[in-house]
């Protein structure tokens, strides 16, 4: 069995799990997430824990058991605590402003960039150069952060652009005469 799948997923207080065929639903304080479980993976609930095992012993089934365990663990963490990703804007005149479901970005283009946030994702701007992207779906939070960063990735000479808060930008030396 996969080493990841051997570890059970602990269900914190206030988190409910429901099975309907191959559909797994996780409900918590922050919302509900659903996942289609692969047919080769068996999920069992016992004593406030979810256990994952492969129905047959082949390599793909063991791999899917580990993948499913990781996805369900992220779902449980998302509906109980949520996920957030912090972005920083570095550059003269680079600004961000969150207005409802739209993130307005001034990134040095001749036009402002308006990014429509998908359902289930919120954005906050504690300052004009910081963006906090929050949600319960880890994949979606990371996807939105990557798309916003993609508008103006950090460049290696001056470091200008949109970067993750924990990102280290490798700098290059300017050309010498």
From Swiss-Prot:
Example of a GO biological process term: cytoplasmic translation
Tree of life domain: Bacteria
GO molecular-function terms, A-Z: rRNA binding; structural constituent of ribosome
Key word Hydrolase present: no
Secretion signal span: none
A GO cellular component entry from the record: cytosolic large ribosomal subunit
Keywords: Ribonucleoprotein, Ribosomal protein, RNA-binding, rRNA-binding
Pfam family name, one: Ribosomal_L6
UniProt cross-references to SUPFAM superfamilies, sorted A to Z: Ribosomal protein L6
Function: This protein binds to the 23S rRNA, and is important in its secondary structure. It is located near the subunit interface in the base of the L7/L12 stalk, and near the tRNA binding site of the peptidyltransferase center.
The protein's assembly and partners: Part of the 50S ribosomal subunit.
Family: Belongs to the universal ribosomal protein uL6 family.
Name of this protein: Large ribosomal subunit protein uL6
Source organism (scientific name): Pseudomonas entomophila (strain L48)
Gene behind the chain: rplF
